[in-house]
Regions:
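Extracellular/periplasmic, surface-exposed regions of secreted and cell-surface proteins
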Residues: 1-166
């Protein structure tokens, strides 16, 4: 037999860590801003602006493509091969651009990152019998994958080998 297969799809990743409300402005109740004390000598703390909001934020996305086949020859030799190509985009990053400290807030998360991942998996298996009571098989598996960060919003580095992009 010979079986051919292929698939294509768009998936999303909502596993974004602890900052669930990146679309909303946050304010932090902190002792960094001292407003004074009460008559009973209790400290009055203030609010500090946190990371800037991004109302256009969305989940990370990935386009996935896979093509492959499997076959059996002579009832004893199984061969399978798969090629895959995945492209992730809109990966959440904090932009490397600096904003003046007098703004008093950090840059927001943005959907800027891009990666690609491609490779293959292959398998060859021979199975047979010796008489009626002994069965054996030999199998060889192999794979190769190549991952590349296409964009990661990194700061300017002094040497090229410091960059994770590329």
């Amino acid at each position: 037999y010979l079986k051919l297969r292929t698939s294509y799809g768009l998936t999303g990743n909502d596993e974004i860590g602890g900052d669930r409300f990146m679309y909303d402005q946050e304010y932090i109740y902190t002792s960094d801003y001292f407003l004074g004390t009460t008559s009973k000598n209790h400290t009055i703390r203030g609010l500090m602006q946190g990371r800037l909001a991004n109302p256009d934020i969305s989940w990370e996305k990935e386009r996935k493509f896979n093509i492959g086949f499997e076959t059996n020859l002579l009832g004893k030799l199984d061969i399978s091969f798969d090629y895959f190509y995945n492209r992730r985009f809109d990966i959440l990053c904090i932009p490397s651009r600096n904003i003046p400290s007098y703004i008093g807030a950090d840059m927001p998360y943005m959907n800027l990152g891009k990666t690609k991942n491609q490779g293959f998996e292959a398998s060859i298996r021979w199975s047979d019998n010796i008489g009626k009571k002994i069965q054996y098989f030999a199998q060889l598996d192999g794979w190769m994958a190549k991952n590349k960060i296409l964009y990661n919003s990194e700061s300017i580095q002094t040497e090229d080998y410091f960059y994770r992009t590329g």
